[in-house]
């Protein structure tokens, strides 16, 4: 069987690897580099890809960068006097990788495993497969990037059982996956992410800073100058990389533009502290997906054995420190963050060809899938973070007598009502025989394949008639919709938490009132008038707050009552102890005297 190459098709850089024996090997490009810039430029009818394209980006307006961010959209890019889809541009990058892989191997390559961010939607995954097809590659498998990284990290550790957290911050996307490794099984427990966060955003913060500073000094807005902007981008990327190793870097861009008095130059010192300040909000955004993934996996931080950093942006010191602070662990640096994803993809290729034995990769679907049922309810058939491939069936019935057809409304999301979730598609099962409501048996089956592609089938168990829909790429979720669903679900979870806290408070108030009234009654006539009066006053205050239904006041008055009731209970206990000691003779009498001292102290603290 011919080799299956592994490709990491990245936003900023791409890489290709192949399995040699039992080891995954990165293939260097014609310039000797182990990663290739994901840049395409057009010049005199020639297509230039990689390092050469990146070098001429400043002077060549027909240069395309970060095309991955447009995958799965209908947006096109203009270059070379034509319009290109993201799939076409991506295919050019894939063709280049394929070409130098063929030169290295000395044979034709027709099959590949390509990685995508874990949170890529159906449209983006389909677009990636289409790009592979355009490039002449049969895409054997789409693998999530953090999963591929885990595969490369754990291949030589199949005899160990570990739970690992993969923190993948690339050029344009961010993913967190939690996996359980053991006996050759790589089981993804949960995944979370942000498809609009990556190294490009860190670059943009520096660009915005440079533009603002230059405008302040010279009154000229460089953001409107395309050539100047490309120079700023190159300088920002270099400064970002420099600040991973030094605490200050000099940005020097001579002849950046011209003013009334002649040429103008951009000279600036950027410190790591300033860079950290500019990008603080971006670093903060990495924390929520980490917490979400841990919560979904049902794990605590103490149960994570290793934290693996993936993606070039994890070299940023502030990011590393945030990971340490969030996980409480020193990240494992045994893998190369730029190469590990492609290496994992090649290993998956080896699993497919049979060259890698006893390795099983179990990935997950990032959002729940289901249908709309009576009353507009979203009935889940497949839960978020379910291992794929998977299939799930459930039997439903009609909502009205003699109903001739049922509409199957396919949805994806986490909210309980259908209207709050994302519609993936609709189809109809017709020719249902006339029968009272609830009698017909309609079986709905969801299938998700190994690449995350969804298909839904509805079957009338009485007539055996069935109808199927495959969710097409144009019905995939956008990044914004995924973010909205997650935020909505989080907002609802927060509301549920508050409701529970309110119920718990009311129950606690009722219990405190009952217990205090009992104690006040038991201490009547026992000489604790001051303490009893204080407890009674606090009790009356709490009852008033309860009657007014003021939660914050109830909480405060409850704390006050607990303090006063405790003082009264102490007095009651001390009296009982003193009486018991009085019966023990002279030694007991001395002890009673001490107890009396305690009473004096108690009155002092109550003052």
UniProtKB/Swiss-Prot annotation:
Swiss-Prot/TrEMBL induction comment: By stress conditions e.g. heat shock.
Question: Per UniProt, what is one GO molecular function of this protein?
Answer: ATP-dependent protein folding chaperone
User: What this chain does, per the record?
Assistant: Acts as a chaperone.
Lineage runs: Bacteria, Bacillati, Bacillota, Bacilli, Lactobacillales
**What is stated as this protein's family in its record?**
Belongs to the heat shock protein 70 family.
Q: Which Gene3D superfamilies match?
A: 1.20.1270.10, 3.30.420.40, Actin, Chain A, domain 4 (3.90.640.10), Substrate Binding Domain Of DNAk, Chain A, domain 1 (2.60.34.10)
| UniProt biased composition (Acidic residues) | 598-607
Modified residue annotations for Phosphothreonine: 173
Record keyword Chaperone present: yes
The record's region (Disordered) falls at 580-607
Gene name? dnaK
- HAMAP family per record: DnaK
Q: Which CDD domains match?
A: ASKHA_NBD_HSP70_DnaK-like (cd10234)
Residue stretches of biased makeup (Low complexity): 580-591
Q: Which UniProt keywords apply?
A: ATP-binding, Chaperone, Nucleotide-binding, Phosphoprotein, Stress response
Origin organism of this chain?
Streptococcus gordonii (strain Challis / ATCC 35105 / BCRC 15272 / CH1 / DL1 / V288)
State the protein's name. Chaperone protein DnaK
């Amino acid at each position: 069987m011919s080799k299956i190459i592994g490709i990491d098709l990245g936003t900023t850089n791409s890489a290709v690897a192949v399995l040699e024996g039992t080891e995954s090997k990165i293939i260097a490009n014609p310039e000797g580099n182990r990663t290739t810039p994901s840049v395409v430029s057009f010049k005199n009818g020639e297509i230039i890809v990689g390092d050469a394209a990146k070098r001429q980006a400043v002077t060549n307006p027909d240069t395309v960068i970060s095309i991955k961010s447009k995958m799965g959209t209908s947006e096109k890019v203009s270059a070379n006097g034509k319009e290109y889809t993201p799939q076409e541009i991506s295919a050019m990058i894939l063709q280049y990788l394929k070409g130098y892989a063929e030169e290295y191997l000395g044979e034709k390559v027709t099959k590949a495993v390509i990685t995508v961010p874990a949170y890529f939607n159906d449209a983006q995954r389909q677009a990636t497969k289409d790009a592979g097809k355009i490039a002449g590659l049969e895409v054997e498998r789409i693998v999530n990037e953090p999963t591929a990284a885990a595969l490369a990290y754990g291949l030589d550790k199949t005899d160990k059982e570990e739970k690992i957290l993969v923190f993948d911050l690339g050029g344009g996307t961010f993913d967190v996956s939690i996996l359980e490794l053991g006996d050759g099984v790589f089981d993804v427990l949960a995944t979370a992410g942000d498809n609009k966060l990556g190294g490009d955003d860190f670059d943009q913060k520096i660009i915005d800073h440079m533009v603002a500073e230059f405008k302040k000094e010279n009154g000229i807005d460089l953001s409107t100058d395309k050539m100047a902007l490309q120079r700023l981008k190159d300088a920002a990327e270099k400064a970002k990389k420099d600040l991973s190793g030094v605490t200050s870097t000099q940005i020097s861009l001579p002849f950046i533009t011209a003013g009334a008095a002649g040429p103008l130059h951009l000279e600036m010192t950027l410190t790591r502290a300033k860079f950290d300040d500019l990008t603080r909000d971006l670093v903060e955004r990495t924390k929520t997906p980490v917490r979400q993934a841990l919560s979904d996996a049902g794990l605590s931080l103490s149960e994570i054995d290793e934290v693996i950093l993936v993606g070039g942006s994890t070299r940023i010191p502030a990011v590393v420190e945030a990971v340490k602070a969030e996980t409480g662990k020193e990240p494992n640096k045994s893998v190369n963050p730029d190469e590990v994803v492609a290496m994992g993809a090649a290993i998956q290729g080896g699993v497919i060809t049979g060259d890698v034995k006893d390795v099983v990769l179990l990935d997950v679907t990032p959002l729940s899938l289901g249908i709309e049922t009576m009353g507009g309810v979203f009935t889940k058939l497949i839960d978020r973070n379910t291992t794929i491939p998977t299939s799930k069936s459930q039997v439903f019935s009609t909502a009205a007598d003699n109903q001739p057809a049922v509409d199957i409304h396919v949805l994806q999301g986490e909210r309980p009502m259908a209207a709050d979730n994302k519609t993936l598609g609709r189809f109809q099962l017709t020719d249902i025989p006339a029968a009272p409501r609830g009698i017909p048996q309609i079986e709905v089956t969801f299938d998700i394949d190994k690449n995350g592609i969804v298909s839904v089938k509805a079957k009338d168990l009485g007539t055996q008639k069935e109808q199927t829909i495959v969710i097409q790429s144009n019905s995939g979720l956008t990044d914004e919709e995924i973010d909205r669903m997650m935020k909505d679900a989080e907002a609802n979870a927060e509301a549920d938490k508050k409701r529970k806290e309110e119920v718990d408070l009311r129950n606690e108030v009722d219990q405190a009132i009952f217990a205090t009234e009992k104690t006040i009654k038991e201490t009547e006539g026992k000489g604790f008038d001051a303490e009893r009066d204080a407890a009674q006053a606090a009790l009356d205050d709490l009852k008033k707050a309860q009657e007014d239904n003021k939660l914050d006041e109830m909480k405060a008055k409850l704390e006050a009552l607990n303090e006063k009731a405790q003082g009264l209970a102490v007095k009651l206990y001390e009296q009982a102890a003193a009486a018991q000691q009085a019966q023990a003779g002279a030694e007991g009498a001395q002890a009673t005297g001490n107890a009396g001292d305690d009473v004096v102290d108690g009155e002092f603290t109550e003052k």
